């Protein structure tokens, strides 16, 4: 599930109970703040809700992986994933728990979408 903006707690709970891996892409909105394309007063509630949802997903142990939507407006190739990781750490702190959680989500994606060897 990419982006997943505007989910509520019930949806996050259902996500945690499923095998779905959520790739939030926080920086697609966060990086727009202050650039003038949209008013910050519009962006800030969206950013806050995304951060709250990430925190809830972490608490409920939903499967989550990093992704940046690189190439989107203000999400530069090469830096987007670093920006996304920084956004995750600003919400959840810098911990082994975060690293393990992200690794589990990434491994779930790799396992499900593994190409068969010929």
Regions found by a protein language model. Give the residues of each.
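Active-site core of metal-dependent hydrolases
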Residues: 1-51, 65, 70-72, 92-95, ...
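His/Asp/Glu-enriched, well-ordered alpha-helical/loop segment
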Residues: 38, 48-118
